[in-house]
Design a protein with these regions (language model features):
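Alpha-helix N-cap/helix-initiation sites
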Residues: 11, 15, 32-36, 51
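Residue-level detector of alpha-helix boundaries and kinks
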Residues: 6-7, 27-28, 68
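Short, charged, low-complexity amphipathic alpha-helix
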Residues: 1-17
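Short helix->loop/beta-hairpin flanking segments within DNA-binding domains
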Residues: 20-35
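Short N-terminal micro-motifs specific to bacterial/archaeal maturation
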Residues: 9, 33-34, 45, 102
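Amphipathic alpha-helical "recognition" segments
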Residues: 17-24, 40-117
Length: 120
């Protein structure tokens, strides 16, 4: 049980690298090396606890390429996925510096509310 918690904590701190890795596996179809039928089957095998989280990590990698990785690590994956929502909506107009500052300053729930207010 402690090992599982330690593994989850490591995933939470290495989410930037993990998102990049998952995107590479999907785009290169490296899941076929294990004789799997699909990328989803790969995720079921490697991320049995949460395929959704795996897709979140991939979205962070794909949607926030201009944000320095240490800054993403600093705010954490749950706030980074909220940043993804704003980045998708605003596209090239996304002001990452302003939103990163908000992510650093606000508690998780307050930041989520700020994003929801912005998007509605």
């Amino acid at each position: 049980m402690e090992w599982e918690r330690a593994t989850e904590r490591e995933r939470d701190t290495r989410f930037v690298e993990l998102g990049r890795y998952l995107c590479e596996v999907r785009s290169g179809q490296y899941w076929r090396v294990d004789n799997l039928k699909s990328f989803d089957e790969f995720l079921e095998k490697r991320f049995p606890e949460s395929r959704r989280k795996a897709y979140y990590l991939m979205a962070i990698h794909e949607q926030l390429p201009r944000i320095p990785k240490p800054e993403l690590r600093e705010v954490g994956w749950t706030k980074a996925i909220e940043l993804v929502k704003v980045a998708r909506r605003e596209g090239q107009r996304f002001d990452s510096a302003t939103w990163l500052q908000k992510a650093r300053e606000l508690p998780k729930e307050k930041f989520k509310q700020e994003v929801e207010r912005h998007l509605t």
